[in-house]
A protein has these predicted regions:
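Short hydrophobic alpha-helices at membrane interfaces in multi-pass membrane enzymes
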Residues: 226-245, 283
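Perimembrane helix-loop-helix junctions
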Residues: 224, 256-290
């Protein structure tokens, strides 16, 4: 309004001097491409040479400068990203195609199916469900629209590019702590190959991968958390949108924000701040807590009635690791690193806790996340239609511990060399050597495992479906599916109700709990006491019982011996 009242020339006169919108977009694209080219292949500026000096005979003998690959690879950023891309391609050799397996369900054919599933009020999952669809379905639908609606292509590209994107996001944060690329690039490289990152890719954990990418951007956007009133409302709302995207994938983000913001409010209250300053801080902090939770409604509101959803992640509910494994920074579960690949995360946090630099603050945050992860890993939850409890997956909490550990390591190493040179040999030299040895051993062991045995992960491409073709021919026909899961030493039998096709993205998240009568009938069918199981199944419209090979022959003979069932 102020410029409108003070302008001297009308907008019609000015518009003739402004280039068209398409020209501006094309010029911006050219500038971005030129900036990337100059960053990757820097050009040395040469001073202008006169025509007389250029014709001198001795200048003709000077060789011209040529592009050398060795100079390019000496750039730590280019070498780090290139090495990570090569490792990712080798360990992803079984993931070129439509992905499923682990916690990742099969992708629908296109974005239209995702949009339809998101807006449906009744879902044909199991016995039927009226639960609200999670907001991450809409996020995937919008992203797949950019790829011409190819949802399977989006999921494949996301898992292939995830390690590089995680490294880039971590590097953008770590370079704020140190200008030495020989420290920040290896640190971001290890962040992308951390146990939680490798396990998330192998087991199909969408939410944890998104958290690994978004977490480093949060302290960049909100650089001054203690004096939050200095941040503009535009920055606050921008962070709200970023937190809403993360909350749409996992509601544990709300619990983390509740703990962090609650602690900050109590600290401000103890400092006895002036009332205007205290209110200015509390308004912006509560905005970061409430707005992301509202933006992912109504799925978030249903979690208030079913608190177990705060600990659930997208996809099938697979068990996480034990508390001892989580304490080492490894979330455990299917596709996780073996126990002998010891991560330096806990050692870094302990060393940084006794540091006199800013590394101590990062260590305090990291240990808080680590303690929360160990606590919740001992809890079993019942979500996504499961009738039995499953050990909680705490990968999202370990993201905070991993990022804090890497940041503390960067702060320590940035000033470690000068401190060690200026001091005599004492415990700092021993701890530094021990840390470097553990980090090197983890790097070699994790990379070696990921490109060999780790490539045969639960998430693979073009995996065979569970349901055979003759059962998928009848649409919406209810089928009780029995299959064995687990290792050769400890096997268990799982069952679920199918609607004529394999479960797809989003369906496990809206699945309702099993009907108690069907649950009892299925258990009696397996143990051989289900004389009336066929009557219960027919009463609920279950037409077929499908046993997925390999399966115990004794259980199959038991089912054949019961009345009311006929082989087809």
């Amino acid at each position: 309004k102020f410029r409108k009242t003070k302008r001297l020339v009308s907008a019609r006169v000015i518009s003739s001097y402004i280039p068209p919108r398409w020209s501006q977009i094309r010029l911006s694209g050219a500038r971005v491409a030129e900036a990337i080219r100059a960053k990757v292949i820097p050009v040395t500026e040469s001073s202008p040479v006169s025509a007389l000096s250029s014709l001198e005979e001795e200048d003709l003998l000077v060789p011209t400068q040529r592009f050398q690959m060795s100079k390019l690879l000496k750039n730590p950023a280019i070498f780090g990203y290139l090495l990570l891309a090569i490792i990712t391609l080798i360990q992803s050799r079984n993931r070129f195609g439509a992905l499923n397996g682990g916690a990742l369900a099969a992708s629908p054919s296109g974005a239209r199916d995702l949009w339809g599933f998101y807006f449906e009020s009744w879902h044909q999952v199991g016995m039927g469900s009226s639960h609200a669809s999670p907001a991450w379905i809409a996020v995937l639908a919008m992203a797949s629209t950019l790829l011409l609606g190819k949802a399977p292509l989006l999921v494949t590209v996301f898992f292939l590019a995830a390690p590089v994107l995680i490294m880039w996001s971590g590097h953008t944060f770590l370079r704020k702590l140190s200008s030495n690329q020989f420290i920040t690039i290896p640190a971001s490289f290890l962040y992308a190959l951390s146990p939680v990152a490798l396990t998330s890719v192998n087991s199909g954990r969408l939410a944890t991968l998104v958290a690994l990418m978004i977490a480093p951007q949060i302290p960049i956007i909100l650089s001054n958390w203690k004096q939050v009133e200095l941040n503009s409302w535009r920055r606050i709302y921008g962070l709200c949108i970023l937190l809403a995207v993360l909350t749409s994938f996992t509601l544990i983000t709300t619990l983390v924000c509740l703990g962090v913001i609650g602690y900050a409010i109590v600290t401000d209250y103890d400092e006895k701040l002036a009332k205007p300053l205290f209110l200015a801080r509390i308004y912006k902090r509560l905005t970061l807590l409430i707005f992301p939770f509202i933006l992912v409604a109504p799925y978030s509101f249903e979690a208030l009635v079913r608190p177990a959803r705060f600990f659930a992640e997208p996809g099938l509910n697979l068990a996480g690791g034990t508390a001892a494994l989580v304490l080492s920074g490894n979330p455990g579960g299917a596709g996780s690193l073996p126990w002998w690949t010891i991560s330096p995360i806990l050692l870094l946090l302990i060393i940084a806790l006794f540091s006199s630099s800013n590394a101590r603050s990062f260590a305090q945050v990291g240990i808080s996340f680590m303690c929360a992860a160990v606590l919740f890993s001992s809890i079993s939850i019942t979500v996504h239609g499961n009738s039995s409890g499953t050990r909680t997956w705490v990968g999202t909490l370990l993201v905070g511990a991993t990022l804090a550990s890497v940041a503390a390591g960067v702060v320590i190493l940035d000033r470690l060399r000068t401190v060690l040179i200026a001091s005599n040999i004492h415990y700092r030299h021993i701890l530094a050597g021990l840390l470097l040895i553990v980090t090197a051993m983890y790097s070699v062991s994790s990379i070696g495992w990921s490109i060999t045995a780790g490539a045969d992960s639960p998430v693979q491409s073009n995996m065979k479906g569970v349901m055979p073709a003759f059962l998928t021919a009848e649409a919406d026909t209810k089928t009780l599916v029995l299959r064995e899961v687990g290792s050769a030493n400890s096997k268990s039998i799982q069952y679920y109700i199918s609607r004529g096709e394999d479960i797809s993205l989003g369906e496990p998240d809206v699945a309702s709990g099993q009907v108690r009568a069907i649950e009892i009938a299925a258990q009696e069918l397996i143990d051989g006491s289900g004389i009336s199981s066929s009557q219960v199944f027919s009463a609920y419209g279950i037409k077929y019982i499908f046993v997925k090979n390999p399966f115990s022959r004794n259980v199959i003979r038991t089912i054949d011996g019961l009345g009311g069932f006929a082989r087809t």
